[in-house]
A protein has these predicted regions:
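Conserved, mostly hydrophobic/aromatic
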Residues: 6, 18, 46, 59, ...
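Beta/alpha (TIM)-barrel catalytic core signal, keyed to glycine-rich beta->alpha loops juxtaposed to Asp/Glu
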Residues: 108-258
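Short, acidic/polar
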Residues: 25-38, 81-96, 140-150, 196-202
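N-terminal binding-site loop/beta-alpha segment at the start of enzyme catalytic domains
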Residues: 1-70
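A structural motif
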Residues: 40-43, 97-100, 133, 155, ...
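Acidic (Asp/Glu)-rich catalytic clusters
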Residues: 7-10, 40, 59-68, 89-98, ...
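Alpha-helix-loop-beta-strand connector modules within alpha/beta enzyme cores
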Residues: 56-75, 122-131, 179-182
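Active-site groove signature of glycoside hydrolases
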Residues: 92-112
Length: 259
């Protein structure tokens, strides 16, 4: 089993994070069964967002009974401190918890910092002081904002699109996070569906010891494939390497950065 430590957070999990955006599309009971199966199979990191309609509610419904054994990451797209607090209180209620492990700014157009006019980072610090969040993260699709977040030293984690179609600039972010002891959470590890070989995607991500891929899962068969990687992590074999190179030639420039 491959494990990853999310930088200075010390959070240590296997290299299979559950991306909970797709569970919006299934019923509450279907989601509960899927999430329970994920937990039973060894997945302990679950990522959601206030913007993902009822995803937080489904997570709280399904996993509140094992809260002390899992890590919850969620996000706020708030533009003001007032909306930050509203989102945070809603997320805490829906997730049925009194503390969120990683609370992330959701794809902001800028990098929130202490004392700026948005008040967002100051609100996050206050929430941390109050024990409502443990760590402050940021998610983004813009290289410039991601790099600024790394350079600032203010953030415990960065969530950014990363897969085997990544560019040298994307790889530089991974290295930057490692140097800053900052967790790197990889969204879109299948490039929004462009990549169809999950084993190859896993093998690629597994080469980077500080990268935690989160997989968007809504079907039992998808989950079972990723659970199989916990017991037998796919290796970067020559056939997989050749397939990746072929995909890079065919799909270069198509890497999905949007939602």
């Amino acid at each position: 089993m491959s494990e990853v430590i999310l930088g200075r957070t010390g959070i240590t999990v296997n290299k299979n994070g559950f991306g909970a955006l797709p569970i919006q599309r299934i019923t509450k009971e279907q989601a509960a069964a899927l999430l329970q199966q994920a937990y039973d199979g060894g997945i302990t990191f679950f990522d959601t967002a206030r913007a993902y309609t009822d995803s937080e509610e489904k997570l709280g419904y399904a996993l509140s009974h094992v809260r002390s054994h899992i890590y919850l990451a969620t996000k706020t797209a708030a533009q003001t401190a007032d909306d930050f607090w509203k989102d945070l209180e809603t997320s805490l209620k829906l997730l049925k918890t009194d503390c969120i492990d990683i609370y992330q700014f959701h794809n902001p157009a800028f990098c929130p910092k202490p004392g700026d006019e948005s008040g967002l980072y100051d609100a996050a610090l206050k929430a941390k002081e109050q024990g409502k969040i443990r760590f402050i993260g940021i998610t983004n699709h813009r290289l410039s904002v991601a790099q600024e977040a790394i350079d600032s030293g203010l953030y415990d984690t960065l969530q950014f699109p990363f897969c085997y179609l990544a560019t040298e600039k994307d790889l530089a972010l991974v290295q930057g996070c490692k140097e800053q002891n900052m967790g790197f959470i990889a969204m879109k590890s299948l490039s929004g569906g462009l990549i169809t070989n999950a084993a190859a995607a896993y093998a690629y991500a597994d080469q980077y010891d500080n990268v935690l891929p989160i997989w968007g899962i809504q079907k039992k068969e998808e989950l079972e494939q990723f659970l199989s990687f916990i017991k037998e992590p796919p290796a970067m074999t020559e056939p997989i390497r050749a397939m990746i190179e072929q995909d890079r030639k065919l799909l270069s420039g198509s890497f999905c950065r949007g939602c």
